[in-house]
Amino acid sequence: MKAYTAAGLDEVGRGALFGPVFAGAVILDNQAEDQLIDAGLKDSKKLSALKRSNLVPLIKKISHCWAIGQSSAREIDLLGIRNATEKAMIRAVHRLEKQPDVLLIDGCLNLRLWHGEQKTVIKGEDLYPSIAAASVLAKVARDDLIKRMAEKYPQYGLEKHVGYGTALHRAAISKFGKTKLHRKTFLSKIQ
C-alpha cells in the first residue's frame, strides 16, 4: 500500500505594504513532527525571531522535503493578493522534491490551481506541525529578504516592521514616496 503524503502549507506577508508574499510547503513524517514539537515548533507568529531562526536548520534537516515560493509586489498589484498568494503557494508545492497526495493549508484559501486533494484549516499551524514548519520557513525567508532590502531603502525602516503598515512605515511612504517594491494597490489611502 502506498504511503499517504501530506504537505503543510502557509503564507507570510499577505498584509504587508512592501515586498513579496511568501509561502512555505513542508512534508514531515511522524518522527520529524515529534522532534520539531519537542524543539518548540509552533505558529511562527508565536515564536521570537531568534527561535524561528534556530528552528530553520532543524526543519530543513529532518523534513522529508520542503520548499518556498513567492509572488512579487508587481504580481500582487497585477493579480490581486488572493491570486498572488495562491501562485506563491503553488510555486512552493511544485518545488517540493515529492508531490503530496493532499495539501494542508492554513486558513481558508482553497487553491484553484491545485487539482489534487486539499484541506483548509483555520489556525492550522496550531494543529499540524507541517503547517507550523511551513510558516516558520516562509517567515524567516521573507524577513531575511526584507532586511536585505532595508539596506537599499534605509529611509523606510524596513528592518523594524518588515514591510507591514506600521505608523513608521506609513509616515516614510508619505515623506519619501513609494519604491518599486511597494504594493501600489495597497497604498491608495497613504499617498
UniProtKB/Swiss-Prot annotation:
It is found in: Cytoplasm. Residues 4-191 form the RNase H type-2 domain. Its EC number is 3.1.26.4. One of its GO terms (molecular function) is RNA-DNA hybrid ribonuclease activity. The keyword Transport does not apply. SUPFAM superfamilies: Ribonuclease H-like (SSF53098). A divalent metal cation binds at residues 10-11, 106. InterPro entries: RNase_HII, RNase_HII/HIII, RNase_HII/HIII_dom, RNaseH-like_sf, RNaseH_sf. Belongs to the RNase HII family. The gene is rnhB. Gene3D superfamilies: Ribonuclease H-like superfamily/Ribonuclease H (3.30.420.10). GO terms for cellular component: cytoplasm; ribonuclease H2 complex. One of its GO terms (biological process) is DNA replication, removal of RNA primer. Manganese or magnesium. Binds 1 divalent metal ion per monomer in the absence of substrate. May bind a second metal ion after substrate binding. PANTHER family: RIBONUCLEASE H2 SUBUNIT A, RIBONUCLEASE HII. It catalyses: Endonucleolytic cleavage to 5'-phosphomonoester. This is Ribonuclease HII. It comes from Prochlorococcus marinus (strain SARG / CCMP1375 / SS120). The keyword Lipid biosynthesis does not apply. Endonuclease that specifically degrades the RNA of RNA-DNA hybrids. Keywords: Cytoplasm, Endonuclease, Hydrolase, Manganese, Metal-binding, Nuclease.
